[in-house]
Each structure stands twice: as structure tokens, then as C-alpha cells.
């Protein structure tokens, strides 16, 4: 699968398109998101990578930062 850095930039671009007001460089990403933002992220990543993400994946740890989102996607591939 894709190199971590390449995947991180791909995911950043995708998520900035659907959630332009969110700072994806933050290490406190989860605190910036409401439930709609969390759902949008999970659906966007599920569709883009053909993986299954659900409410059990929507943890503060998984949504802490862009790096943790990339790790989550890679763990499902």
C-alpha cells in the first residue's frame, strides 16, 4: 500500500475539500470536530479506500491527528 507520507497528503487533500474549516495540522483534531465532522471523515475515508469504518473507530485516539487517521486507514487495508 501507499507510503505513509503520500497517503497523509492524499487524505489531507480529501478532508480539506469536505471540511475546509478544520485545521488538519492540529494534534487536537478530535476536539475541533462535531459529530457531523467525525461522520464526514469516516465516510470520506471509507469511500476513498474501500474500507469499513464505523462508530467504534471514532475514538479520540484515532481522530487525534492526521497521522492517527492515516494509521487507522492503513490498519484497515
Model-derived features: where do they sit?
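Thiotemplate assembly-line natural product biosynthesis machinery
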Residues: 3-24, 72-77
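Phosphopantetheine carrier-protein modules
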Residues: 14-33, 50-59
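Phosphopantetheine-attachment site and its flanking helix in carrier
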Residues: 31-48
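AMP-binding/adenylate-forming catalytic domain of the ANL superfamily
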Residues: 57-68
Amino acid at each position: 500500500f501507499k507510503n505513509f507520507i503520500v497517503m497523509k497528503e492524499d487524505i489531507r487533500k480529501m478532508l480539506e475539500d469536505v471540511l475546509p474549516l478544520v485545521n488538519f495540522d492540529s494534534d487536537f483534531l478530535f476536539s475541533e470536530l462535531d459529530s457531523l465532522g467525525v461522520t464526514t471523515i469516516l465516510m470520506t475515508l471509507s469511500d476513498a479506500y474501500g474500507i469499513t469504518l464505523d462508530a467504534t473507530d471514532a475514538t479520540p485516539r484515532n481522530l487525534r491527528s492526521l497521522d492517527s487517521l492515516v494509521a487507522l486507514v492503513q490498519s484497515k487495508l
